[in-house]
Amino acid sequence: MRKGAIGIGTLIVFIAMVLVAAVAAGVIIGTAGYLQQKAQAAGRQTTQEVASGIKIVNVFGYINATPPSNGTIVKMAILVTPNAGSSGIDLSNVKIVLSDGKRLAVYNYSGVLYTGKILDLFNLTIWKNTSNGTFSIAVVNDVGSKMENHHPTLEWGDTVALLLRTDDVFEYEGKGGIGPSTKIIGKVIPDAGAAGVIDFTTPPTFGYNVLELQ
């Protein structure tokens, strides 16, 4: 009788252990599933962040002097296009950050957009409305016709020139603008996705009025 009671007790303990193990396994499996889903979601978000964003095609500078060697870069045009995985980028939320190592400037969208023919980019009338600390937009290619003044949207296949003045921010030897042999770094920062990187050094001498800087 006593042996039977011990056997039943052992069986009860064994069943309890099995139940506890089953519950623990269920918790572990549930937690693992949750963590896997969370990791997948984070991976998708990271992939989207890396794939989307702005790509800088070229950076051009303009020197309003004759000969150019006597002047400084007073205007800049940054040609951009979206990265391959980008959804629409609202350019009204974009910030342009530039630094020459002495000062750092942040440019915001001016609300001015140009969609006509571009025969002389640095002499368009749009520059009259491009003031201190702002950038305007000249549309080079608008595939989906989503470019409008208030919320110009940059989509796959589009190219625009972001136009800004440098003579009201930077200075070289008493003259407004960016001088020769000057290191410039910066970014074109969208509200979501990767920023376009600006990184160039101006030539030691300016031989032309329009220079390709990057």
From Swiss-Prot:
Alphabetical UniProt keywords: Archaeal flagellum
Predominant location: other
NCBIfam families the record matches: arch_flag_Nterm (TIGR02537), PRK08541.1 (NF006325)
Similarity section: Belongs to the archaeal flagellin family.
UniProt propeptide residues: 1-4
Locations listed in the record: Archaeal flagellum
Task performed by this protein: Flagellin is the subunit protein which polymerizes to form the filaments of archaeal flagella.
Name by which UniProt lists this protein: Flagellin B4
Biological processes annotated in GO: archaeal or bacterial-type flagellum-dependent cell motility
GO molecular function terms listed in the Swiss-Prot or TrEMBL record: structural molecule activity
One Gene Ontology CC term in the entry: archaeal-type flagellum
